Amino acid sequence: MCSSDLRTESPHDVFDGGHAGTGLSIGQGLALARDVRGTDERVAVVVGDAALMSGLSLEALNDIGHRGTRLLIVLNDNEMSISPTVGAISTYLSRVKLSKSWRRSKGGYDRIIGSVPVIGPTLASLSKSFRRSVISFAQEPGRLFEDLGITYIGVLDGHDRPVMEEAFEAAFRMPGPVIVHVRTQKGRGYRPAEADPITFHGAALPKMEVGVATDSYGKAGSEVVAPAPKAANYTSFFAAELLEVAASDHRVVAITAGMPTGTGLDKFAAAYPERFYDVGIAEQHAVAAATGMAMGGGRPVVAIYSTFLQRAWDQIVHDVCQNDQPVLIGVDRAGLVGEDGTSHQGMFTLTAQRQIPRIIIASPKDEQELRALVRTALAQDHPFALHYPRDSVTGTAPRSPELLPIGAAEDRKSTRLNSSH
């Protein structure tokens, strides 16, 4: 079973995809196509709280609210993508959950204002915009969405099916866009996943009745408590070498787009919190901000999966390379990544980057060369893309990392296996 939506796998999957933040735009397009046809289908989009803060989602919300499109948006708020969500929008949603009582007491505000001696009746008759500015001090839940022209319902228990059905039916009866804000728990229903949602985000699916996991080929394993620890991989060596360099070079800063654990930068964050930046699911912003940091004298390192780096193509070309800034782009999970599904392959980034002037591109043959390339990249005054796979490392004997010459290749003879075809 594919790890993300796949139309050939299920009639309930209407779109092939696995990248966060695209749903609102796709849903808007489906709803607009429905309106052009003059039909009456119901269009609903489920978007996570982490995906909501991506640039594409905000662009879509702007258009949806402007056009008043009849569309149901379900905001699935579990405070996580793979790692916990970050940023001002995440803080806003948390504040909304803390002020649930607002809607229950909202009707009392006009009565309170109207009862003020002498000037009460005048206050009660003021314009809607002025009254909104007064009562905004109470932190009205969903005010952000309401101001964009999207009706807000929430916060509701996303695990309460009758409540969900009632809310959805009410939302579908409304004429314009509606957002239903639901609170959920990641991994709900499977205790190990509830206890460790980050690890279980990409774990093999367990057989729930016996608690046994299978590997990619369907071979049953032992009873699952947590996924087995993985062997050391290129990501861990990249992160470890970055930590070593950062200890002596205070210009080095690390940036991730919502994936500190997946890119190994969680260790950098623990060691140097003042030099670590998780910008959320916002790859374009991550790369553009890195350009600014480099222009300001820093040595920024942006670690992003190859598949997600595609989203920041213009920033690599226009911001980093056109300005010839010393940004190190750690292209994690480069190449074929079979178990990550069709939407998460890393085979396109290398071909695309080879067309760009001024960027240096390298890929290590083993973990020791990776360590050397990290240091080599940070010693350059030009953009540097370091591609490395998801794979486990080769077990090459440790050696002191040295700066490598740019443009030189190593000719390694390989023994060909006998083949009968």
Question: Where do the model's predicted regions map?
Answer:
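Glycine-/acidic-rich phosphate or pyrophosphate-binding loops and their flanking alpha/beta elements
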Residues: 139, 166-169, 201, 210, ...
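Short acidic, glycine/serine/threonine-rich loops at helix termini
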Residues: 52-61, 82-88, 93-94, 165-167, ...
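Cofactor-binding active-site loop characterized by glycine-rich and histidine/acidic residues
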Residues: 1-67, 252, 256-257, 265-266
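Short, small-residue-biased leader/transition segments that mark boundaries at the very start
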Residues: 2-3, 417-421
